[in-house]
A protein has these predicted regions:
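Conserved alpha/beta-hydrolase "acid-adjacent" motif
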Residues: 287-296
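C-terminal catalytic histidine-bearing segment of alpha/beta-hydrolase fold enzymes
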Residues: 295, 306-379
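Primarily recognizes the serine-hydrolase "nucleophile elbow" in alpha/beta-hydrolase
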Residues: 180-236, 373
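Non-catalytic accessory segments flanking enzyme active sites
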Residues: 25-108
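Short beta-strand/loop motif that positions the catalytic acidic residue
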Residues: 274, 280-282, 286
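Acidic beta-to-alpha connecting loop that harbors the catalytic carboxylate
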Residues: 125, 284-286, 317-318
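Mobile cap/lid helix-loop segments that gate and shape the active-site cleft of serine hydrolases
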Residues: 219-220, 226-270, 276
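Cap/lid segment of the alpha/beta-hydrolase catalytic domain
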Residues: 78-101, 105-193, 198-201, 235, ...
């Protein structure tokens, strides 16, 4: 196991002026590396401890997570009548057969074969799950004609310890989400040629990754306030955040130990492979995925993929929650589950719906023959 520990005294290679003025060394003798001692408070040193050993990590309350998941199930089911079809689903990940739970939301009045556009909607994390907080936006998607699948990929909460500890950030979780496409294609009323993907934060990270694969089944993607660069991210996040990555079996190390692994798992380094339209919205006052990280993706997309990328930077949008601008477009009253709109939230969602409608055409019922278009007199 490897670790980093900030000691009470940190030794750094430096040569003070006084040391440089010492007596000249004998010819042929290598210069000594002089040391300078920098004192550090012991309490601060304790805070800077980082370990990638699983036994050093704080335990999760799995019973509480499972209970919260049951409450989410109940709320989503209770609000479904007259609004949307709701179903708890499972499917096997195509990478290793792991059972992936999720939700299906669909219009009550189904069209015929291939009648509906569809989307895979990816929740955030690091450890997280699909909750009722996104319900008003999902309802609007269904009203617009979309069929929605929301996978709880490996590492999600509410499904027990083994599933939680199977987290593989930027690894097998991508395949878990990708396999949701196969589930959608198994539904006769879903058009396999009109499937999109979107997500926020960690969900935006997964969305961007899958959009930037050389071969992707998605026709369009929206990544909002996405994690983009794990190498850089771990340089400005604290030890607790670093532990959550470095302890994962698929990573098992910090960026300085496994730089290639972190690069492989960072969407920023795969922009060149993007070949579908993508929408990216970020906020300058984001206190989770800080703008200093997201601006790298925005600039690179604008430089390399201007014909495929639609990007917008929201300058200090109305805050929501502890992460300030991170949830600027997910402002929902936790009690009523109604939108708490701000100008930025309204603008972001309007742009998102127009983006997807331009590409996926959710209002088109392709189970019916396309109407004939007159080409001239008598036609």
């Amino acid at each position: 196991h490897s670790f980093i520990r900030a000691a009470v005294a940190i030794v750094v290679g430096a040569a003070p002026l006084a040391a440089q003025q010492q007596t000249a060394r004998p010819q042929g003798q290598r210069p000594q590396r002089l040391r300078q001692v920098v004192k550090m408070d012991s309490a601060r040193a304790e805070e800077l401890y980082v370990s990638n050993r699983a036994e050093d990590q704080p335990p999760a309350d799995f019973e509480r997570q499972i209970e919260q998941k049951k409450q989410t199930d109940s709320i989503l089911a209770a609000r479904a009548p007259g609004a949307y079809e709701f179903k708890k689903i499972t499917y096997k990940s195509n990478v290793d057969g792991l059972e992936i739970p999720g939700y299906l939301f669909a219009p009550l009045n189904k069209r015929g074969a291939h009648g509906h556009a569809a989307m895979v909607w990816v929740h955030g994390g690091v450890h997280g799950d699909w909750t009722q907080s996104m319900l008003p936006f999902v309802k609007e998607a269904v009203e617009r004609g979309y069929v929605i699948v929301t996978p709880d990929y490996r590492g999600s909460t509410g499904h027990g310890a083994a599933f939680y500890n199977a987290i593989d950030y930027g690894g097998k979780e991508l395949d878990d989400v990708l396999t949701a496409v196969d589930y959608l294609k198994s539904l006769s009323y879903v058009d396999p040629d009109r499937i999109g993907i979107m997500g926020w934060s960690h969900g935006g990270f997964i969305t961007a990754h899958l959009a930037m694969r050389k071969e992707t089944p998605f026709k369009a993607a929206a990544a909002i306030v996405p994690v983009t660069n794990l190498v850089f991210r771990l340089s400005y996040k604290g030890p607790g955040y670093q532990r959550s990555y470095s302890t994962q079996p698929g990573i098992a190390g910090l960026p300085f130990e496994k730089p290639d692994e972190y690069i492989k798992r960072s969407p920023l380094y795969h922009v060149e492979d993007l070949n579908i339209p993508i929408l990216v919205h970020v906020a300058t006052n984001d206190q989770d995925v800080n703008y200093v990280e997201d601006q790298q993706l925005v600039w690179k997309l604008r430089a390399l993929k201007p014909d495929l990328a639609e990007t917008k930077v929201y300058v200090d949008p109305a805050p929501w929650g502890a992460s300030v601008g991170h949830a600027f477009s997910r402002r929902v009253d936790p009690k009523t589950l109604e939108r708490v709109d701000s100008p930025a939230q309204i603008d972001s969602w309007n742009r998102t719906w127009v983006f997807f409608e331009w590409i996926l055409r959710p209002y088109e019922d392709r189970s019916k023959p396309a109407p004939k278009v007159a080409t001239g007199p008598g036609q």
